[in-house]
Amino acid sequence: MSTLEIEVGDLRARSVEFTPTELVVTLMDGRRIATPLDWYPRLLKASAAQRANYEIMAMGIHWPDLDEDLSVAGMLKGQKAY
């Protein structure tokens, strides 16, 4: 596998946390991805309870109270939500 290839299994989220300015996702292999919270307006405006109510899906994270879905691959690519 080249260094540019990413195995899908490597992208599974294990946990989600928030700092005042970032969304931080820890992957199953221990890596952490931190992205600016202002990239995701729904999450930025959400209450702590709404942010805490998330579901880890096969390829990303879903917040049912917010109807927000983020893929781990999208976070790595720097894709912002609109």
Enumerate the predicted regions with their spans.
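Motif-centric detector for short Cys/His coordination patterns
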Residues: 1-82
